[in-house]
Amino acid sequence: MEIREITTPDEKQRIARLVLEALPDWFGIPEAREEYIEKSAAQPFFAAFDGERAIGFLCLTETGEDTAELYVMGVLKEYHRRGVGKALFAAAKQRAKELGYSFLQVKTVQMGKYPEYDATNRFYLALGFGEFEVFPTLWDEWNPCQIYVMSLK
């Protein structure tokens, strides 16, 4: 497996589409998925490759002068629990530090709502994120938004 930073907007969108469309349990709302794909073109973007096959990606965005967010991340299901997400995160975290950010944040569905998101929550906690706040209706009442944060200092 190799992690590469992708700089070409079309390539970012191609990889994001390939991965997100293969993950309907997490990215099943077409409008939301298209927004992730569209916005990923202009953001710092890292992709994981198995040979020349893109198997995952992570995209950062700025949410404040001192804070970057893991805007969207996806790894093909057959590559889950193989260190792909951890490697993508390590590359993105390093870039966030280089860009001068003090904090990273990530949003996901609160633990206890859906098994696939419970695994996502455990992944972020294992990376060292801490619980910050839950917004019960930011997305909608069925998907309470859990925000996790991490200091980069």
List where the protein language model places each region.
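Conserved acetyl-CoA-binding loop-helix of GNAT-fold acetyltransferases
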Residues: 81-94, 98
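Short amphipathic alpha-helix that is part of the acyltransferase structural core
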Residues: 1-31
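Short hydrophobic/aromatic beta-strand or adjacent loop that forms the aromatic wall/cage
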Residues: 43, 143-147
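Conserved beta-strand in the GNAT
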Residues: 47, 53-61, 69-74
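Conserved GNAT acetyl-CoA-binding A-motif
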Residues: 96-115
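Active-site acidic-Proline motif in GNAT/NAT acetyltransferases
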Residues: 76-82, 112
